[in-house]
């Protein structure tokens, strides 16, 4: 599941990711919890085939009405758009993980009609790009901060950098 766009206030920014397995176990987050709960119910109740017809990606919007925004815990009338994608061998996740381990920036293009995925060299980060036919996401290594010395200042600097999703190395 990928957050592709948001309108108004949203708990998670575009590009946020979450995975759900058939047992309802999750990794990642796309909201403050209520949307995750609904997605888990859909996957477990209807099954992934019902959510993603014929194994193809599906687009969902939460918060279209004020009642729905309140029900799913979206602050201030926010709206969140998600793309749900069934994971299979053609998802190229091992290749994407390997590129990340090798600190290579990668662009992942998901064809929304067929579910086909292609990987290309890309930039480190960026917002997802959604069209009628494709979702393009950008993955890359985290920014790295190398801190020389292990005093109090280094500790505070490292904590701030970790909070900003930096990879921190203290020498």
Name the predicted role of every residue range.
Residues 1-171:
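Segments forming oxygen-rich coordination pockets for charged ligands
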């Amino acid at each position: 599941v990928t957050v592709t766009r948001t309108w108004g206030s949203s708990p998670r920014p575009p590009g946020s990711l979450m995975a759900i397995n058939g047992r309802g176990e999750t990794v990642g987050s796309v909201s403050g919890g209520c949307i995750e709960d609904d997605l888990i119910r859909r996957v477990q109740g209807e099954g992934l085939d019902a959510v993603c017809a014929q194994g193809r990606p599906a687009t969902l919007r939460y918060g279209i009405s004020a009642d729905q925004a309140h029900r799913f815990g979206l602050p201030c009338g926010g709206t969140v758009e998600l793309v749900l994608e069934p994971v299979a061998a053609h998802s190229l996740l091992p290749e994407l993980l390997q590129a990340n381990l090798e600190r290579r920036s990668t662009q992942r293009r998901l064809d929304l009609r067929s579910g086909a995925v292609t990987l290309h060299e890309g930039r480190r980060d960026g917002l997802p790009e959604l069209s009628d036919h494709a979702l393009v996401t950008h993955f890359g290594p985290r920014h790295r901060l190398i801190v020389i010395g292990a005093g109090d200042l280094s500790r505070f600097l490292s904590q701030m950098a970790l909070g900003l999703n930096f990879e921190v190395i203290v020498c």
